[in-house]
A protein has these predicted regions:
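Negatively charged
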Residues: 1-105
Length: 105
């Protein structure tokens, strides 16, 4: 699932991707990287992330993104890499508490 929307720089919104089956996904890195005009996301909080090991650069440089669905409910137990996950994002973005204090920018 990595890099699906990477560099879609004119993408403003997405269709409903909330019901995507992510049960066996292990990599979500660079998923929305460089989607500079993306200003909202569907409710991706329903995604099953229990097998995901890499979320690096997932929302990197999503400069117009002003809010996230409640991804604090995701399962991060197997996550090994999350470097720069929110790098270049608005400092007003509602970052989940799991990432507060981490080097993620």
């Amino acid at each position: 699932m990595e890099r699906i929307f990477e560099c879609c720089q004119s993408l403003i919104s997405l269709p409903d991707i909330s019901e995507w089956c992510t049960y066996s996904v292990t990599k979500m890195n660079f998923l929305f990287d460089e989607c500079r005009t993306l200003n909202s996301l569907p409710d991706i909080s329903k995604w099953d992330t229990h097998n995901v090991t890499d979320m690096s650069y997932m929302f990197c440089n999503c400069k117009s993104l002003i809010s996230l669905p409640d991804i604090s409910i995701w399962d991060y137990k197997k996550l090994q890499a999350s470097n720069s996950i929110f790098e270049g994002c608005s400092k007003n973005l509602n970052i989940p508490k799991q990432f507060k204090g981490c080097i993620i920018f």
